[in-house]
Structure formats: structure tokens, C-alpha cells
Amino acid sequence: MPRSCCSRSGALLLALLLQASMEVRGWCLESSQCQDLTTESNLLECIRACKPDLSAETPVFPGNGDEQPLTENPRKYVMGHFRWDRFGRRNSSSGSAHQKREDVAAGEDRGLLPEGGPEPRGDGAGPGPREGKRSYSMEHFRWGKPVGKKRRPVKVYPNGAEDESAEAFPLEFKRELTGQRPRAGDGPDGPADDGAGPRADLEHSLLVAAEKKDEGPYRMEHFRWGSPPKDKRYGGFMTSEKSQTPLVTLFKNAIIKNAYKKGQ
């Protein structure tokens, strides 16, 4: 009696499952496992055969399709095609955007490496491609250069021999040499050679020029505005005293005439 009740309940359950499967697919009734349902073992085998197919089918929900529950977590949706992707590669549904960025970065790193150079080793001993890359410094801007490397002004003298002589001889020694100037034709042991005279004159002129340079302020005589001629000063308006004499005489005569008229 209990066995017959169990078989009846099993047959009822199988009938419900088969009815549900017939709405989706009716191949369970045609299978060999569901042909003989007289025994409990055959009934269980038929249920096991039809159960995975029923669970794999998409359920049909009544009503509007917009009100159906979501099949996946809403946080898994990531707009990977935008730049402000915040969830990262793990939470994104498709990692194509991240893969694309990594491919671009890898291509840039390959372009930085020289052709035919040694490839980085896989054991981790060699430095990565980004470690060997130099940091970007804005050297083409004024504020990109370091503070310590300032350019010093280079002093340029018009006559190199004059500067050498000024450094070689101190001021007291120069004055002693100018007081004891040797003659052009005589040397310390007697008459000098033909080239000794011009050489002595050159040294004496250099010493005199250096002494003048040390005594007074530096004047830029090699420029036009260093010492302009007197007749060119003030645009040529104020000329010499001789040229100013007729103008002064004219002013004096005018003043005298005005005073004479007022006295009358």
C-alpha cells in the first residue's frame, strides 16, 4: 500500500514535470528512460534526465518584460569605453577597454627600447622598461632648469695680450718696469738683435695701457657713445665759444635797447 502511494505521488510529480517540459521542449516523453514508469527506479531516472534541461531553459515571467528581475548584479556593469571607468578590470563585465590601454602602453614601451637590444629577463633581475625611462623635465621653459646650474656671464676683452700682461705683472712691478724702460737698440749685455727692439716697445706700450686702465675708470672708447666729439654733443646745438659770440652779442644789444627805452 505505501509503495503504491509512493508510485502514485512520483507519477504525479513526473506528470507535472513533463507538462512543464512539453511547453518548452517535448523530447523527455520520447526518451527511452521515460517510456517505462511502472517502477520507482525508472521514475527517478526519468526525473534526473529531465531536470537539467528544465533548469537550463529560460523561465517565462508573466506581465511586462521591463518588470522582470535583473539576471546579474548592477554593479558589474562598467562603462569601460569611457575614460572615467572606476571599477577596474575585475568588476567590469568586459575588459576590452583595459586590455586596449595595456596594449597601447606596451607598444609605447617597445618603441622606447632600441632595436636589437637585449630583451628584459623574466626572472625579475633586469629593470622594467618604465624604470629605465628618464623623467620628463621641462628644460625648454625657464622654470624647468635647476637652480644651481646658472649661466655665468663670460668676460670678453678686446685684446687678449693686454689681459695676459695685466695678470702676469702686478701693479708695483709694472711701475718699476715703466721707470726702467730699456732702450730699443740696447739690451742688458749690449746691443740687442733686430727683433728685440719692437718686442720691448710692445711690452712697454702694454704696460702703459694697463697702468692707465688701473688708474682711471673704464671708458668705452671703442663704442660710439663712449666719448662723443664736443661738436656733436647735445645734437650740435651747443657749439664752441667762438660760434656762440654773435648770439651773445645779439642778446646783449636787445637787453640794452629795452633798458634804454624804459629809461626814457
UniProtKB/Swiss-Prot annotation:
Name the UniProt key words of this record, in alphabetical order.
Acetylation, Amidation, Cleavage on pair of basic residues, Endorphin, Glycoprotein, Hormone, Phosphoprotein, Secreted, Signal
- List residues, modification N-acetylserine: S135
> Describe its PTM?
Specific enzymatic cleavages at paired basic residues yield the different active peptides.
Gene this protein is translated from: POMC
This one is known as Pro-opiomelanocortin
Listed GO cellular component terms?
extracellular space; secretory granule
Q: In which tissues is it expressed?
A: ACTH and MSH are produced by the pituitary gland.
Signal peptide limits: 1-26
Q: Any idea which GO molecular function terms this record carries? A: G protein-coupled receptor binding; hormone activity
Q: Glutamic acid 1-amide (modified residue): where?
A: E131
